[in-house]
Amino acid sequence: NVGKSTLMNHLIGQKIAITSKKPQTTRNRIQTVYTCEKGQIVFLDTPGIHKAKNKLGEYMVAVAERTLKEVDAIMWLVEPSTFIGAGERHIAEQLQGVGVPVILIINKIDTVKKEEILPAIDTYRKICDFAEIIPCSALRGQNTEDIIDSILKYLPYGPMFYDEDTVTDQPQRQIVRSEERRVGKE
């Protein structure tokens, strides 16, 4: 669990996406909207790309892979590690030919020593050509404004898709149901 939903919730300032310590908590694509004076960002929080072990896993990976073709920029969230496994290499290969800027977000920097962050950046830089690499802590809000500024640089100019009060395409009932499901499992 690299903290995609935690980051989305922090960036828009509301708890929309379910967060959990378990990986693959996000099962469907969740759209959230961030609006500021500089522009509007529509985030698509997808299930993580992983090696599927069953039909649900295959569905979740397909949702994530389809989304790669619909966006103006991609944020790839990882943890601060110098170990690159087969899963990360697979994702890096998929991202090489997408034709849009890929921003690497190294999340959870609050869980490692500062000296460990640069080696993690160097490790990831070797496997993919990133437009930018931003270390952050979604939980603590460290460097999250840098993420917003970075994304805004890559978005095309045009009208806003949503009014400034919209934060998600999820109906309130779905958000409550998701929260009830999460609370019921803890």
Predicted regions and their residues:
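Conserved, well-folded catalytic cores of nucleic-acid-processing
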Residues: 14, 33-37, 52, 67-74, ...
